[in-house]
Amino acid sequence: MTRSSLTTLVPMSNSFNEEPQNASDASAAQPLDGNEAINLAEQQSKNTAHRNIPPLNLDEIPLADDTANLRQGPSLHDGLLALLPLVGVWQGFGQANDNGEEYAFGQRLVIAHDGENYLRFDSRIWRVDSEGNSVGADQREIGFWRISLKDEIEVTLTNSRGLVEILYGEPVNDRAWQIESASTIVTATGPAAHGPGKRLYGLMPDNSLGWVDERMQDGQLAPHMSAQLTRIAG
């Protein structure tokens, strides 16, 4: 996978003939200089800085609640600073090619922490029609991200379709992260044709989060899923 995959494979978040929500959405594909990027981030934070994942409101336990907002809750562990931009709640649309079956999907991705040296990763994906309307659930994926002192990323993921995966990788730069399958296990009722692969996550010029997943098919990597997500909390 090349770094350019992120811009060539990830669809725009205003797919399905949606009107752009604001001028920054309409110009998402346009490169920004440093000052423009900072100004855009400040503008966007006015809508998301006060939002967070809701507490459970159950009996207290002697542990900190998860937070997807770096302004609220426990401080981010110093060991996670290289992953800091990922923390938040992200939502948008994407495209999938699952062994020849192509479909569009919506996704909400929560990347949260509780002050310990890991990030919680929680993805929910639903299928959508050509107008962007939901036509039913697709899959869920939960797991944890860790990173060593040498900037080696370790990811464990469990997928509701019957998949367990361990991935390793490293930051591409301070706004992009690439991971690769080290072990992919499919359960007896899971998708037998699902092979190992690579993922690339990165912040786009408009500060949305894009990601690309490529999987081995017929001996070579092929596009599997990709999406572009807008920060809605954090």
What are the roles of these predicted feature ranges?
Residues T2, P85, W145, L209-W211:
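Bulky hydrophobic/aromatic packing residues
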Residues R3-Y118, D218-G234:
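Amphipathic/hydrophobic helical signal segments and adjacent flexible N-terminal regions
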Residues A49, P54, G136-D138, H194:
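Signature of extracytoplasmic/envelope-associated structural regions
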Residues L86, Q139-E141, G197, M225:
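Hydrophobic core residues within well-ordered beta-strands of beta-rich domains
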Residues V89-Q95, D122-R124, F144, T156, ...:
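Residue-level recognition of well-ordered beta-strand positions that form the cores
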Residues G100-P191:
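Central antiparallel beta-sheet cores of small beta-barrel/beta-sandwich binding domains
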Residues V186-G234:
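Mixed-charge, glycine-accented linear interaction segment located at domain edges/termini
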